[in-house]
């Protein structure tokens, strides 16, 4: 059993070393190149950070960003991707929360980063990689990385993603290796993702949908294609990209799928390799779902549900029939090793025997994350002892979403308790 996500990378490198692991518009890395580059970055960063320390990453996503993430993990730290388009005020709130000693940028983001007023050391990834010529790390660095790995636990943090929540103040969800490994094992097995797949990444790396793209690829030896953001403004470019790169699997925000059908993209082209189409973040309009299913009658369509705080998703529904325009998609069933249930206002269980009654959607299992970074008050409010269990410690996550069971026992999403809305899958 894996205890560190680096085992995903190293296992795939052993089996598929010369296969493309990740590609963007300007670059691609094989599994061997990705691993070696990550080890080089890790050997450099291990001199600058302590184990379990957070490293903020301030750049656009590229193949090198992925090698940086893995390099941070080799150094024993956890990564936190920052959106370079966000206001400096928000970025600085996040940097203050992480209490970072270093900030990693690239040539494109370096000048913008200087204006943040960051007090620690700014490291330019592009400049760092100029010193790297594909060589293996030296024996001293190898020994240093080995010691870090020996001391690592599967409960060590892997990444942090900041959500705004209902207050607009960023909350940093902190997710460990165990939660990620357990979820990705279930996810790839449930949907049959293999080394033959090509995953088309839509989600920004500061959004947890990207976790499924990244680690499903690393786990199985699939190829990860990073789709430029610009493509989602021009469906013809998007469809060309999917077709040219032979993308088989997309795990997108609902709104990204709807862009294609709203602008009649399929009148231009139908990418021929797609066979797994998954979506989350918002309620999927049946009209748009049906338009996609007409184009891909043999593909697997999956409705996914779950907030960042439970490691990506906790339920899934494989669509196996035609839905009418007046119908809603069910949430489906929990992933293996996760329990999903409803609690009423008095913390009593709302089960399928009480159809139509609203309850707060709650989740337990190893996918429940470590809470909010340096925010004990918010953590204590949402990550709580299971009120149905008075026998031993069992932490559950209260999602703040309301759900209900239908007459035939299907679980449905109703609404937020606090009236948040979503944009491109982000809670705002």
Question: Model-predicted segments: where are they?
Answer:
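Conserved AMP-binding
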Residues: 59-62, 83, 193, 203-207, ...
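Hydrophobic alpha-helical segments in the ANL/AMP-binding
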Residues: 9-11, 63-81, 187-188, 210-222, ...
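A generic "structured core" feature
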Residues: 34, 67, 71-79, 93, ...
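AMP-binding/adenylate-forming domain of the ANL superfamily
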Residues: 1-160, 175-176, 182, 285-290, ...
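ATP-dependent adenylate-forming carboxylate-activation enzymes
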Residues: 27, 59-63, 77-93, 107-110, ...
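AMP-dependent adenylate-forming
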Residues: 4-6, 88-90, 103-116, 120-150, ...
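Gly/Ser/Thr-rich phosphate-binding loop
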Residues: 219-222, 247-251, 261-330, 336-339
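Conserved AMP-binding/adenylation subdomain of ANL enzymes
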Residues: 171-200, 208-248
């Amino acid at each position: 059993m894996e205890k560190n996500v680096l085992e995903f990378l190293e296992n795939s490198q052993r089996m598929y070393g010369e296969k493309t692991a990740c590609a963007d518009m300007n670059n691609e890395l094989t599994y061997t190149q990705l691993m070696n580059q990550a080890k080089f970055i890790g050997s450099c960063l291990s001199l600058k950070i302590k184990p379990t320390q957070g490293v903020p990453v301030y750049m656009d996503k590229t193949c090198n960003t992925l090698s940086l993430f893995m390099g941070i993990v080799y150094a024993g730290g956890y990564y936190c991707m920052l959106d370079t388009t966000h206001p400096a005020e928000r970025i600085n709130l996040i940097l203050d929360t992480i209490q970072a000693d270093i900030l990693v940028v690239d040539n494109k983001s370096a000048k913008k980063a200087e204006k943040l007023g960051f007090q620690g050391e700014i490291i330019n990834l592009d400049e760092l990689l100029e010193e790297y010529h594909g060589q293996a790390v030296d024996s001293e660095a190898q020994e240093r990385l080995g010691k870090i790995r020996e001391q690592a636990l599967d409960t060590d943090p892997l990444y942090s993603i900041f959500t705004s929540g209902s207050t607009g103040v960023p909350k940093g969800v902190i997710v460990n290796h165990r939660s990620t490994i357990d979820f990705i094992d279930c996810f790839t097995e449930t949907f049959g993702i293999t080394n033959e797949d090509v995953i088309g990444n839509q989600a920004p790396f500061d959004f947890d949908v990207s976790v499924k793209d990244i680690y499903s690829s690393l786990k199985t030896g699939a190829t990860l294609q990073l789709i430029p953001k610009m493509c989602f403004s021009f469906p013809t470019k998007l469809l060309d990209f999917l077709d040219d790169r032979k993308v088989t699997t997309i795990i997108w925000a609902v709104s990204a799928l709807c862009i294609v059908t709203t602008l009649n993209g399929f009148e231009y082209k139908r990418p021929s390799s797609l066979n797994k189409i998954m979506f989350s973040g918002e309620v999927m309009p049946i009209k748009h779902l049906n338009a996609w299913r007409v184009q891909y009658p043999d593909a697997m369509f999956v409705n996914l549900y779950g907030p960042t705080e439970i490691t990506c998703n906790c339920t899934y529904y494989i669509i196996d029939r035609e839905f009418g325009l007046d119908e809603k998609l069910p949430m489906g069933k929990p992933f293996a090793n996760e329990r999903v249930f409803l609690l009423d206002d008095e913390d009593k269980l709302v089960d399928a025997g009480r159809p139509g009654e609203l309850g707060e959607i709650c989740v337990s299992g190893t996918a429940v994350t470590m809470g909010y970074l340096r925010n004990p008050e918010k953590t204590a409010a949402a990550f709580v002892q299971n009120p149905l269990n008075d026998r031993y410690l069992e932490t559950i996550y209260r999602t703040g979403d309301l759900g209900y069971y239908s007459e035939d026992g299907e679980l449905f999403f109703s609404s937020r308790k606090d009236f948040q809305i979503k944009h491109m899958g982000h809670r705002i």
